[in-house]
Amino acid sequence: MNGADLRIGIAGITGRMGKLLAEAVPLAGATLAGGIGRDGDLAALARESDVVIDFTVAATVSRHAGILAAAGTPWVLGTTGFDPAAEADIADAAARIPVFQAANFAPGVNLVIALAERLGATLAAETHDAEILEMHHRQKIDAPSGTALAIGAAVARGRGVDLAAVKDSGRDGHTGKRETGAIGFAALRGGQIVGSHSAIFTSAVEQITLTHHALDRRIFAEGAVRAALWLAGRAPGRYGMRDLLGL
């Protein structure tokens, strides 16, 4: 299916990202099938759409997974901050429909994620401490950001460990010395910062920093629409920016 024939629906069209998506869809040569707010009729939207892009809230993810799987409609999911139960529901949906999930749709930040994994594999945890720093606008409701967690997970994969076993995001007060192999997180909030992420590797003799600054929220909308165009016609399964970018 070419872009001109592709009907894209937007869940969360009344939000900041949803409005940008509504502008980005026709610019990419696709057709805007319609959109709903977080409490709208997703089943009806799914019937009118070849792909649904979802930027709503974490509490809706499980319900949306069931509705879109039942409708057979491919799903581009940009919502973050959901719990393990919702993650399981996404996996169940991916057995029936193609699901494209990303914490961040900017190509550049996904290159940072790929490089973070490479550095995690190359720089020993015993010599190089890994810290993830992120800053976002004051309205953001989850921390660390989904992108920060994705960067941390990439470092952990490179080191052959599970992020949950080494994640340190609660430093406050008398914490004691830093644990060898820990992956630390710090989240800053203020103003209207679109999104800044850094992966910092520090040893006794050097420091390596990977940084990405998003300057305009349109980069996320354009990436999500690109993902929708790519996802249409794919087999059921889970896909992400690595697949889209060939990383």
From Swiss-Prot:
Report whether Cytoplasm shows up as a keyword of the record. Answer: yes
Entry's Pfam families? DapB_C (PF05173), DapB_N (PF01113)
What EC class is this?
oxidoreductase
Positions of (S)-2,3,4,5-tetrahydrodipicolinate binding: H137, G146, T147
Say where the protein is mainly found: cytoplasm
Instruction: Please provide the record's keywords in A-Z order.
Output: Amino-acid biosynthesis, Cytoplasm, Diaminopimelate biosynthesis, Lysine biosynthesis, NAD, NADP, Oxidoreductase
Q: Write down the EC number.
A: 1.17.1.8
Signal sequence span is none
One Gene Ontology BP term is: lysine biosynthetic process via diaminopimelate
| Catalysed reactions, as listed in the record | (S)-2,3,4,5-tetrahydrodipicolinate + NAD(+) + H2O = (2S,4S)-4-hydroxy-2,3,4,5-tetrahydrodipicolinate + NADH + H(+); (S)-2,3,4,5-tetrahydrodipicolinate + NADP(+) + H2O = (2S,4S)-4-hydroxy-2,3,4,5-tetrahydrodipicolinate + NADPH + H(+)
Q: Which InterPro entries match?
A: DapB_C, DapB_N, DapB_N_CS, DHDPR_bac, NAD(P)-bd_dom_sf
Q: In which pathway does it act?
A: Amino-acid biosynthesis; L-lysine biosynthesis via DAP pathway; (S)-tetrahydrodipicolinate from L-aspartate: step 4/4
A GO CC term?
cytosol
Q: Please name the catalytic residues of this protein.
A: H136, K140
Q: Where in the cell is it found?
A: Cytoplasm
Write down the superkingdom of origin. Bacteria
List the GO molecular function terms.
4-hydroxy-tetrahydrodipicolinate reductase; NAD binding; NADP binding; oxidoreductase activity, acting on CH or CH2 groups, NAD or NADP as acceptor
Is the Magnesium keyword given for this protein?
no
- Binding residue positions for NAD(+): G12, I13, T14, G15, R16, M17, G78, T79, T80, A102, A103, N104, F105
Q: What does this protein do?
A: Catalyzes the conversion of 4-hydroxy-tetrahydrodipicolinate (HTPA) to tetrahydrodipicolinate.
Family from the record: Belongs to the DapB family.
Which HAMAP family does the entry mention?
DapB
Q: Can you name this protein?
A: 4-hydroxy-tetrahydrodipicolinate reductase
Which organism's genome codes for this protein? Acidiphilium cryptum (strain JF-5)
What does the organism's lineage look like at the top?
Answer: Bacteria, Pseudomonadati, Pseudomonadota, Alphaproteobacteria, Acetobacterales
- Gene name, Swiss-Prot/TrEMBL: dapB
